[in-house]
Amino acid sequence: MSSPSPVTDGLNVYVMTGTGILKGFDFAGKELWVRDIQQDYGKFGLNWGYASSPLLYSDSLYVQVLHGMKTDAPSYLLRIHKKTGRPLWKVERPTPAITESPDSYTTPTLVRHSAEVEIVVTGGDCMTGHDPETGKELWRANGFNPDNDPFHRIIASPVVADEIIYAPTKVRPLMAFRSGGRGDISQSHLLWSFQNGPDVPSPVSDGKYFFSVNDKGIAWCLDAKTGKEIWGPQRLTPAIYSASPVLANGKLYVINEEGLTTVLKAGPTFE
């Protein structure tokens, strides 16, 4: 099982499998080290298997295990030294989520605010920010499951642009928060919310425009700062859309499960 994507620092490559095997390789394919996360910390308990990719920052890999559907074990965040595979810390991430809602298939991301860097994690009906040096939780945003749906797992990952954190959930709500908060930022740092977000594909933003494509190929463009709808809903070729859109050179590349790529202009008009 290889749902997670590999990451590289340009010198080595790091791979996490769906069965919890985390390895480092050089570019010649030589294995540098290996860790078995399930052996070290217990079996994963996600309903659909493990799928979060590791986050690479500075000298470390950050690995989230957010689960609950098939386990009573706590969710946690790990920091692993990229050169040796040695664990540097493990912190638990408690939430009140129940049944399948603790499960998260997202990948953590970074947010930079002024001179500070934080690890952003979504899942378990909330979003948290962590100190990359210690793992300490710095802030938390709640309200990700307003209907208390016991099956409100999250698949689409958070994204960051211009110090704004965009956090999708299971379609709704998709919320945008300004960075720099401490403690409970659920209301104090909330910028806007959107009720037509994706389930599986992660959104993308260039800081000016925010683009979202849902599982049915319905595309939207919002003002990244205010959440105002610029265009959408616009239907792409009917199919299932699971891959996240890619933004490059002023264009938005969207691939569906039939292998068709749609290229859109990444701007205020749908074309």
What are these regions (language model features)?
Residues 1-271:
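Noncatalytic, solvent-exposed loop/strand surfaces
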